[in-house]
């Protein structure tokens, strides 16, 4: 029995719950694993750091949701999501950040859509929808 990394709901043999997928897009019925390992994500974050408009200590990537292909894609510009992979020195950082946001929401704070997605090495990557971006694209 699996638990959805977006909603924490039980989801049987599926990777994500229907509710979790609908939080990302009403058009999603499945979501492929992110096409990068945690290590590859950290490398991409290093190479793209000068492009990213959001700074900070944690490695992060800009991404967009491609609903036609049921996957999250790393992009240089126009991303609607920020991805944060597993950290080399601080294990389970994405899980910690997701739980912190969930607790903030439970006490009544407004938080953007967030959760975790599976990567190709079966690690979890934290995602959060950018609240400073508006428009039609996911």
What spans do the regions from the language model cover?
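Conserved ATP-binding subdomain of kinase catalytic cores across diverse folds
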Residues: 39-138
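Regulatory N- and C-terminal appendages and interdomain linkers associated
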Residues: 1-39
């Amino acid at each position: 029995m699996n638990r959805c990394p977006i909603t924490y709901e039980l989801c049987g043999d599926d990777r994500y719950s229907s509710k979790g997928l609908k939080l990302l897009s009403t058009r999603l019925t499945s979501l492929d694993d992110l096409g990068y390992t945690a290590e590859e994500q950290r490398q991409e974050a290093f190479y793209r750091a000068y492009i990213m408009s959001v700074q900070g200590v944690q490695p992060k990537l800009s991404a967009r949701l491609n609903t036609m292909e049921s996957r999250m894609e790393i992009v240089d510009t126009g991303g609607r999501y920020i991805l944060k992979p597993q950290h080399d020195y601080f294990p389970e950082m994405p899980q910690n950040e997701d739980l912190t946001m969930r607790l903030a929401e439970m006490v009544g704070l407004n938080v953007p859509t967030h959760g975790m997605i599976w990567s190709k090495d079966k690690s979890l990557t934290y995602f959060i929808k950018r609240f400073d971006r508006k428009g039609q694209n996911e």
